[in-house]
Amino acid sequence: MKFLFDLFPIILFFVAFKIWGIFTATAVAIVATLVQIAWVAFRHRKVDPMLWVSLGVVTVFGGATLVLHNDTFIKWKPTVLYWAFSVALIVSQLAFNKNLIEAMMGKQITLPHAIWGKLSVVWAIFFVLLGLVNLFVAYNYTTDQWVNFKLFGATGCLVVFIVGQSLWLSKYMKEE
């Protein structure tokens, strides 16, 4: 259910794009992200920092898209967000000796310390590559194709990555 909730702004963006076009869809994405954060704050009293980052990025890049009437900015938004995630993973590990992947998932699964480190690096690389793929699609395909990729392609890549990661991690998981 959380996965679908996380997709809420993307799904609304997709639907709004199909009905009204990129500029209305961009405004919808900004509002949907605000609503998502308000709901999380109301229900859980604590909003994940990455949701705040997402709101900041969608507001800045979406706002630029709307003010300048240029869809290039909203097309850069996923890449900037993916790269921000990648930088956060690497900087938290190198500068603060904190593994964010372990901090997020450590209560659900038990892994050797070295594997947590590898997992963090693999996620950072994945986000860099996904950002590059987003730019490739944004600059080489139509806006309609990019919007389809944003919902189906990027989400599909994430699902395949998580399944592959789960298979790889299964051999390291300690029995409880």
From Swiss-Prot:
Q: Which UniProt keywords apply?
A: Cell inner membrane, Cell membrane, Membrane, Transmembrane, Transmembrane helix
Q: Where, by residue number, does the polypeptide cross the bilayer?
A: 24-44, 49-69, 76-96, 119-139, 149-169
Cellular localisation: Cell inner membrane
Q: Does the keyword NAD apply?
A: no
Q: How does it sit in the membrane?
A: Multi-pass membrane protein
- Among the Pfam families in the record, one is IspA
Q: Primary place of residence? A: membrane
- GO cellular component terms given for this protein: plasma membrane
What function does this protein fulfil? Plays a role in cell envelope biogenesis, maintenance of cell envelope integrity and membrane homeostasis.
Q: Which HAMAP family match?
A: YciB
Family, according to the entry, reads as follows:
Belongs to the YciB family.
What is the protein's name according to its record? Inner membrane-spanning protein YciB
Question: Which organism is this protein's natural source?
Answer: Paraburkholderia phytofirmans (strain DSM 17436 / LMG 22146 / PsJN)
Q: Per UniProt, what is the name of the gene that codes for the protein in this document?
A: yciB
